[in-house]
Amino acid sequence: MKKIIGISANEVVDAGEVLHHLPISYLPAGYVRAVQEVGGTPLVLPISQPKEAKTYIDLVDKLILTGGQNVSPSLYSSNQSSEALSLLERDLFEIALIEEAIKQKKPIFGVCRGMQLLNVYLGGTLHQDLSLRQPERIKHMQSPIERWVATHDIFFEKDSILTQIYGSRTTVNSFHFQSVDQLGTDLKVTAKSDDHIIESIESSTDKHRILGVQWHPDFSYNVNDKEKGVFDFIVNSF
């Protein structure tokens, strides 16, 4: 029987002229296609009230938290930079999804922002703006380089479950302004970049099954077998 994979959606208030400036709920197709190609059934979870989280988690076997806006600094820091690139409504709903998934002992895979939000939920903090770190050795927001192009190396710890897919090192894409700073409770760091940015985290306890990556396998699953392999692992083994 196919696994049902809940995938968190995003929202925009004005979709532009092509879509008549409508407000839309949306999800980058890479997540959907990757889950389908490895044998899962994707179920899109639109931003909703936190009280609806249980209804959604009851429907799924596993949860994917997707990329998108920055996590609201108000959730982890008293020293806030601009909230302009965040969406608190989304943060609060996805935090409720995390809480319910953990309660139901369902695995969670966080991508980019999704990994950061998992860390914040478990009491960790984030670097709010990597461009302020001096010197900036690696460009962690690689745009305008195409999204599927891998631009920097990362290095895995020997005990990472991802070594079975990537080996001890791999090269990944990079599209983020924020990154994990102080690690949340019951998590361990399992990969870093050359400039010591945390690139993957995993559960350090059997209280929950959590895996997070800072890069976007959804951008390159169709051109890189390893990135497709991580979706295969999430859907069929995690």
Region spans (language model):
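N-terminal beta1-alpha1 cap of cysteine-dependent amidohydrolase-like domains
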Residues: 1-109, 120, 127, 131-163, ...
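Active-site-proximal beta-strand elements of phosphoester/diester hydrolases
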Residues: 211-214
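Active-site loop->helix "elbow" adjoining a glycine-rich segment at hydrolase catalytic centers
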Residues: 113-115, 122
